[in-house]
Amino acid sequence: MKVLDITASVANGTVKFLLRSPLHGLVSSRVMLITVSGRQTGRLYTTPVNYVRDGDTITVVSRSHRTWWRNLRGGAPVAVRVRGEDLKGVAEVVVDDKEAVAKALLALHPRYSAERAARRAQDRVLVRIKVA
């Protein structure tokens, strides 16, 4: 295991712990937990992700090389923990609309310029979650 992998694993574990604790307010305004089911194994995977919420829609942007979002292609049920609240929803993945990905990046990172968001969108995917 690489040093960066170990560091990321420890950091993710710490963030997961915080988001499940009464101290979630320290990070839960911008970070949530998403739980997805593996398409082939059925195993549950929980990952902390940055998000922005607009009503019943939660938007997440992930790097293309990450694997968790691939289980959501074609639409899939998910569980999320947002600001201390557990919700169920349905997620869809947007891979080919880089303009939509750039727009989502601007919502997640308001200090980005449009050019920076467009550059970063090239190796990102957009996940839209409709929560009930």
What would you call each of these model-derived segments?
Residues 1-31, 70, 113-123:
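Alpha-helical membrane-targeting segments
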Residues 29-63:
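Short beta-strand segments
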Residues 1-2, 35-41, 68-76:
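Short, functional N-terminal and low-complexity linear motifs
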Residues 1-4, 28, 58, 90, ...:
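Residues at structural and domain junctions
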Residues 64-132:
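Short, structured beta-strand-loop surface elements
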Residues 2-18, 43-48, 81-88:
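Short low-complexity stretches enriched in small and charged residues
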Residues 22, 57-62, 66-70:
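Covalent nucleotidyltransferase core used to form phosphodiester bonds in nucleic acids
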